[in-house]
Amino acid sequence: MEFLTNEKLTIVGAAGMIGSNMAQTAIMMHLTPNICLYDPYGPGLEGVAEEMLHCGFEGLNLTYTSDIKEALTGAKYIVSSGGAARKAGMTREDLLKGNAAIAEEFGKNVKAYCPDVKHVVVIFNPADITGLITLAALDSTRLRSELAKHFHISPDKVENCRTYGGHGEQMAVYASTAKVDGKPLLEIIGTPALTAEQWAEIQSKVTKGGANIINLRGRSSF
């Protein structure tokens, strides 16, 4: 059986409905054989793992743990649905206080245990806010895209781009973690390959990326 990658994928909140379905979907799509399931609720987590193992998926290396350090260490991809569920009578905003704290703690754990993770997906509500609290994934991808265009290389050769803050012109666009074709971006900025002025222009394009798309298309969504 061929997989898209052999790198580790961690599913956070795997004992829940969304998390367990994400685990099954990842396995059936042959994303990677190396999948780790994490949830603080041990019995439910073990039940999900047993159910997946009983399916007899070929080539699957499935592990599970309630230790967040063990779950995240070595992970290159993470999907997190590890927030509280919305109950009857609750609004999305009612979830914010508790789930924002969960998202903040999750972000700190990612930084501590797998700082070289390639992609993080946050899908617990209110997802538009919890996702931003954890990692500004869309804006980080925009930074990678702009750097790839500038250097005329594949986006796959631009790694570890990071942006933080709100989804607008007040966001912070960092160079400290990024690498371009294996070379730290900080070592390139200020050279003829990427002058300080060009870097400032790229930062501006990233923070105004959404507005630019709207100007070009006349609308924001498909």
What are the functions of these language-model segments?
Residues 6, 31-76, 84-86, 90-91:
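Conserved N-terminal Rossmann-fold NAD(P) cofactor-binding segment
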Residues 92-146:
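Rossmann-like NAD(P)(H) cofactor-binding subdomain of soluble oxidoreductases
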Residues 79-80, 122:
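Redox-cofactor binding/interface segments in oxidoreductases and associated redox assembly factors
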Residues 132-133, 139-222:
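C-terminal substrate-binding/catalytic lobe of Rossmann-fold NAD(P)-dependent dehydrogenases
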Residues 19-20:
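N-terminal Rossmann-fold NAD(P) dinucleotide-binding loop
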Residues 23-24, 107:
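Generic hydrophobic/aromatic pocket-lining and core-packing "Φ" positions
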Residues 15:
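Conserved glycine-rich cofactor-binding loop
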